[in-house]
Regions:
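Glycine-rich nucleotide/cofactor/substrate-binding loop typically near the N-terminus or early
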Residues: 39-109
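Structural motif
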Residues: 2, 27, 92-95, 137
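Short, flexible coil/turn micro-motifs enriched in small/turn-prone residues
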Residues: 33-34, 60, 125-126
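Conserved residues at beta->alpha junctions
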Residues: 14, 83, 148
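Internal alpha/beta core interface subdomains
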Residues: 5-8, 97-197
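Short, basic, glycine/proline-bearing loop/turn elements
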Residues: 6-10, 73-80, 120
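N-terminal glycine-/serine-/threonine-rich phosphate-binding loop
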Residues: 1-57
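Short glycine/serine/threonine-rich phosphate/pyrophosphate-binding segments
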Residues: 19-20, 87, 132
Length: 197
């Protein structure tokens, strides 16, 4: 089918690592290349899988105490680039932007941090910027990209991988995108409610 896309490269950046092992094993078995940052990269490598640092792609380090890690044109270009758009493809080649076909990300635990009675400073640090941006980018470009916005979606992707290999249909990618915008909306609503207190 023309709308079927193969997952070749996955960007993985998660706060919660539990439940990720089985999915990583299946993706690795399917020959998917891993890109990651910080603690997630260390976790992936601890399982024995090769994983390229996002910093190697961007040639820019994580800065501002980790506030800026994935926010870079080489990352977002790789997610948002339209594979069927000749202009996008030419620019991706010109600027050496890798295609990213799968984004697995979750968000800093904002609501749990608020509920714990944390200080305003700690709560503000749990307002996710990079993660929410990755979710929105992956969801926007569902024509080409699978977005997994929380660990609740791991089993859904694993089921697809077990049945279809690393191939997804446009309908499946759209379903992931729909749930991703739901995650994004819920998260921003919680932040708005806290600021509105």
């Amino acid at each position: 089918m023309a709308d079927t896309k193969k997952i070749k490269t996955a960007l993985i950046s998660v706060f919660h690592k539990d439940g990720l092992e089985e999915l990583l094993k299946k993706l690795n078995d399917e020959g998917v290349k891993f890109l990651s940052t910080g603690g997630t990269q260390t976790f992936i490598e601890s399982l024995g899988y090769a994983c390229e640092k996002v910093e190697n792609v961007t040639t820019y380090p994580s800065i501002l105490g980790g506030r800026v890690k994935t926010l870079h044109p080489k990352v977002f270009g790789g997610i948002l680039g339209r594979r069927d758009n000749e202009g996008d493809r030419q620019q991706m080649a010109q600027y050496e932007i890798p295609e990213i076909d799968l984004v697995i990300v979750d968000l800093y635990p904002f609501e749990q941090t608020v509920a714990s009675g944390a200080s305003e400073e700690d709560i503000i640090e749990k307002i996710d910027i990079g993660g929410i941006s990755l979710i929105r980018a992956g969801a926007k470009n569902f024509n080409d990209v699978v977005i997994v916005p929380s660990k609740a979606e791991y089993a859904v992707l694993l089921d697809i991988l077990n049945k279809q290999g690393a191939e997804t249909t446009k309908a499946q990618r759209r379903q992931f995108a729909t749930r991703a915008f739901g995650v994004s909306s819920h998260y921003d609503t919680a932040i708005h409610a806290w600021f509105n207190k």
